Amino acid sequence: MQNQKTVKIGNIDVANDKPFTLFAGMNVLESRDLAMQICEKYVEVTDRLGIPYVFKASFDKANRSSVHSYRGPGMEEGLKIFQELKDTFGVKIITDIHTEAQAQPVADVVDVIQLPAFLARQTDLVEAMAKTGAVINVKKPQFMSPDQVGNIIDKFSECGNENIILCERGSCMGYDNLVVDMLGFGVMKKASNGSPIIFDVTHSLQNRDPSGKASGGRRSQTVELAKAGLATGIAGLFIEAHPNPDKALCDGPSALPLDQLEPFLKQMKSLDDLIKGFEHIDIK
């Protein structure tokens, strides 16, 4: 079996052969109070179930389809909210950036900085992120094959940063649809020499009404897609939840209802424990 790398986020070990880590929260910071409410719920549930947890939210959705769509509070206000979440709940934080200038200020506050899928080949941004020394989560672009992630890993490595997590978020299937190739998880592990792979279930459920200005979604299939991904033996899940998904300011149609978080995670933990309890069978 290929050796699996471990990336440390504080006291959390993220690896394909360790219990799964949950990277989860809300799509975009809508308000300070809502962020506190959602984070508190995640912390309560993950503590109760013994699941390692990192809170996720964006301070700026810079790639919204429509210029009229809500983007977020911006970096300055967003970082204040993240710091309060850390101080209040002792939680680790992951968020995405979109420009080189954001890299260091964001890395000074959060624990993981995320390279967006649409920007994953932007070398200047990769270099700026790498130089922070932070743990990096790389979203695999929808247009990129799983074996091409090795090139992104190489860019970060050349810049001196080996603390890389890779995130699957679906692949384009014709126009306005995404599919997840379950064989791709193993390909990504091999292409990255065993880097931790996490699965963005929420954004893999996106689809689009060609006449609309925002993404649709298929949240009713969250459970089956998450189970399929975990069954391949991966390092973590990436999900978004909201107390009222139909009122969410971004990607509500793909978001898990917050009141279903605990039963969802109970099933995910049971499945992950089962899969990782099996002896590895190496077929060549």
UniProtKB/Swiss-Prot annotation:
Reactions it catalyzes: D-arabinose 5-phosphate + phosphoenolpyruvate + H2O = 3-deoxy-alpha-D-manno-2-octulosonate-8-phosphate + phosphate
Pathway assigned to this chain's UniProt record: Carbohydrate biosynthesis; 3-deoxy-D-manno-octulosonate biosynthesis; 3-deoxy-D-manno-octulosonate from D-ribulose 5-phosphate: step 2/3; Bacterial outer membrane biogenesis; lipopolysaccharide biosynthesis
GO cellular component labels: cytoplasm
GO molecular function, one term: 3-deoxy-8-phosphooctulonate synthase activity
Location within or outside the cell: Cytoplasm
InterPro entries reported for this sequence: Aldolase_TIM, DAHP1/KDSA, KDO8P_synthase
GO biological process entries: keto-3-deoxy-D-manno-octulosonic acid biosynthetic process
Enzyme class: transferase
Family affiliation: Belongs to the KdsA family.
Gene from which this protein is expressed: kdsA
Keywords, alphabetical: Cytoplasm, Lipopolysaccharide biosynthesis, Transferase
PANTHER family: PHOSPHO-2-DEHYDRO-3-DEOXYHEPTONATE ALDOLASE
Species of the source: Aliivibrio fischeri (strain ATCC 700601 / ES114)
Coiled coil, from the record: none
Disulphide linkage map: none
Name by which UniProt lists this protein: 2-dehydro-3-deoxyphosphooctonate aldolase
Regions crossing the membrane: none
Entry's EC annotation: 2.5.1.55
Domain of life of the native organism: Bacteria
Pfam families: DAHP_synth_1
